Amino acid sequence: MFDKHVKTFQYGNQTVTLETGEIARQAAAAVKVSMGDTVVLVAVTTNKEVKEGQDFFPLTVDYLERTYAAGKIPGGFFKREGKQSEKEILTSRLIDRPIRPLFPEGFYHDIQIVAMVVSVDPEIDSDIPAMLGASAALVLSGVPFAGPIGAARVGYINGVYVLNPTKAELAKSQLDLVVAGTSKAVLMVESEAKILPEDVMLGAVVYGHDQMQVAINAINEFADEVNPELWDWKAPETNEELVAKVRGIAGETIKEAFKIRQKQARSAKLDEAWSAVKEALITEETDTLAANEIKGIFKHLEADVVRSQILDGQPRIDGRDTRTVRPLNIQTGVLPRTHGSALFTRGETQALAVATLGTSRDEQIIDALSGEYTDRFMLHYNFPPYSTGEVGRMGAPKRREIGHGRLAKRALLAVLPKPEDFSYTMRVVSEITESNGSSSMASVCGGCLSLLSAGVPLKAHVAGIAMGLILEGNKFAVLTDILGDEDHLGDMDFKVAGTTEGVTALQMDIKIQGITKEIMQIALAQAKEARLHILDQMKAAVAGPQELSAHAPRLFTMKINQDKIREVIGKGGETIRAITAETGTEINIAEDGTITIAATTQEAGDAAKKRIEQITAEVEVGKVYEGTVVKILDNNVGAIVSVMPGKDGLVHISQIAHERVRNVGDYLQVGQVVNVKALEVDDRGRVRLSIKALLDAPAREENAAE
């Protein structure tokens, strides 16, 4: 019934198994990948017919996590999985990025990849199995795909690279890097690091690429065994006559456009060139396919002009050489009521970054397959359409915005203070107000500045820079601080963030094969030069953390014995609610007895802290207290005196005065304030007090007689 094929190989410390022919047989190809107890089912479906008018490659990648994979039932009212989580979106992008450039130009057939996590080992992340499964399934589907690709996670522990580290190993690692590529070239890198030198980062990329050859060879052997039927697809031939016509109509205008340094004016000139082509070559009778072909030729001409100018040593689109960073403008404290803010402008790219400080209650609760955890630092990136001068829909953040925000967050994680040194929850929002290249790296710079503006004691300043590459044969140019057009028309997008001491985040997307280690080395060195230049200007604008904003909450931390937690909370929360209401504070109590008080003023925080100290304080024997009589006991036994909140003691009738007391009421009244001395605290916590001990003893009778 099943034509099942299985391939097993050792990958680092894990055993990987590829299976096909048993599940999802109606898909073009389906592969079940197991790595330890983590299992991912990847299915590829295709459309043999191209949709009418299609002029781009419609690749869709969806990575989905099923809660049953971890033996859990979804929360919420509907008890089923809902919209994609941030982890699902980021992993979908991770699969998409190295695969997309391996499809041939002109291939416009629908391809859908669905990677579904059906079993999860908490120690083994499902992203690497999902990437390997997508690679294998594409090869088995027979589509024109220049793969397979391999993927590897690389850690760096005690100076040694570790292949596919477990979650426990990653906790000790200075690096979390995912690299993907073919047998010949690296195509994608995504990483975060704890301020590592460039040579260590590059070494990790090379190490990961070397190690993934095992996976690539295994997928090739797997495909040879399955022997899939390959598509009979041929790339459309270039219509040289049509190319010549388009070049004749628009070639010179395109060249003129790319000499204009201002983005909007340049776009207007390119629109003028395209209008001339449309008017001359596209009529009402022209079918959509032919119109798309003409549009594609026009786009190729744009790319050829920009690329040839740069490789010939001419100035770039905006007049810069290959190593110059655009002019910078840095302002902080631009929004008066926010906790911290910065406006970071680099040429025609601008980010308004705003930092907000909160308490532990503001931490993000993340219900992951591996278990629930909280996150004290959030960075959200917004890319409104007006940032590029366009009209567009506003709505939920798109995959690109989620990815850019995650990259900027990774860049800043290494310099955040420890929770015990700075107990605030931190949120940074980066509003991209202008965009012409590398808005994610502007978010890194702006995010760092806004945190410093908010008074966050960062370990160091962090800056980011985006690099580009143009490669033709043996000629190449590495571009510092790329523009949007250079990003679209170039062969590599290479983003590096870090401090003066090293790299904190590295992201690389390569569109071609042939990027060597030497080219990556040059790009990293050039990026460091630019990063140090930006850091100098950032430090000149903000040398260190500013004073905490008057509008930010003040946090006060104290520690009490765990057995006192119940007293602070009170019956049904009565005591703690009373303290928060009276002082206007917010109080969080951890299980270990750590109390965090959030207040709008120093006075309110001190008042709440004093109340808690009073509740948790112990009565000390021999100490004198000012107390209030709260009750006169029956039968003339004595009186109960409150010496501190929740702490009462007995003043026995014999301890009221030196003389004989016949009636307690003659000496004490409810509400009366008296000074008492603590005589004893017994094993049950009962307190004996004395008023008499503080009174002068009467003179002896013989002394009186004299």
Swiss-Prot record:
Cited PROSITE patterns: KH_TYPE_1 (PS50084), S1 (PS50126)
GO BP terms in the entry: mRNA catabolic process; RNA processing
One Pfam entry name: PNPase
Enzymatic class: transferase
UniProt keyword RNA-binding present: yes
Domain KH: 553-612
CC cofactor: Mg(2+)
Gene3D superfamilies, alphabetized: GHMP Kinase, N-terminal domain, K Homology domain, type 1, Nucleic acid-binding proteins
GO cellular component: cytosol
Catalytic activity: RNA(n+1) + phosphate = RNA(n) + a ribonucleoside 5'-diphosphate
E.C. number: 2.7.7.8
Subcellular location: Cytoplasm
Binding site for Mg(2+): D487, D493
S1 motif domain ranges (all copies): 622-692
Protein keywords: Cytoplasm, Magnesium, Metal-binding, Nucleotidyltransferase, RNA-binding, Transferase
Any one Gene Ontology molecular-function term assigned to this protein's record: magnesium ion binding
Role summary: Involved in mRNA degradation. Catalyzes the phosphorolysis of single-stranded polyribonucleotides processively in the 3'- to 5'-direction.
Family under the similarity heading: Belongs to the polyribonucleotide nucleotidyltransferase family.
PANTHER family attached to this UniProt entry: POLYRIBONUCLEOTIDE NUCLEOTIDYLTRANSFERASE (PTHR11252), POLYRIBONUCLEOTIDE NUCLEOTIDYLTRANSFERASE 1, MITOCHONDRIAL (PTHR11252:SF0)
HAMAP family listed in its UniProt record: PNPase (MF_01595)
Name of the protein described by the UniProt record: Polyribonucleotide nucleotidyltransferase
Organism: Neisseria meningitidis serogroup A / serotype 4A (strain DSM 15465 / Z2491)
Lineage: Bacteria, Pseudomonadati, Pseudomonadota, Betaproteobacteria, Neisseriales
